[in-house]
Amino acid sequence: MNLIAKLEQEEIERALAGKTIPDFAPGDTVIVNVNVVEGNRKRVQAYEGVVIAIRNRGLNSNFIVRKISSGEGVERTFQTYSPLLASIVVKRRGDVRRAKLYYLRERSGKSARIKEKLVSKDRAAAASQE
């Protein structure tokens, strides 16, 4: 492993200290809690939407979450290892056949729905034991 890769790995471990990032994939509905600083106040803001893209680039990894707010589509890009991310919660697993769901930008209503990925009972039991 070269020097830059080692430094990036150390920074990733430092960023993950005390928090866990769940496994999520494009199509999943997630709730991203973000630390927001307004003046001297600090609060946590929740952003819920569908993950439409994940970009794995080591320390520079990010993901895009899309939601519909007041009838308008809003997309927000989050840095995976950012200290501003308080937590990520996977609310619902989506069953999609693409890695990038940019086609959802042109769709609205029923055509923008994503099927839910149903896991079998024995797989769910095995996952809960780990």
UniProtKB/Swiss-Prot annotation:
Transmembrane intervals: none
Record GO biological process: translation
Entry GO MF terms: structural constituent of ribosome
Alphabetical keyword list: Ribonucleoprotein, Ribosomal protein
PROSITE patterns from the UniProt entry: RIBOSOMAL_L19 (PS01015)
Pfam family, one: Ribosomal_L19
SUPFAM superfamilies in alphabetical order: Translation proteins SH3-like domain (SSF50104)
Gene3D superfamilies associated with the record: 2.30.30.790
Role according to the record: This protein is located at the 30S-50S ribosomal subunit interface and may play a role in the structure and function of the aminoacyl-tRNA binding site.
Protein family membership: Belongs to the bacterial ribosomal protein bL19 family.
Protein name, entry field: Large ribosomal subunit protein bL19
Record organism: Burkholderia cenocepacia (strain HI2424)
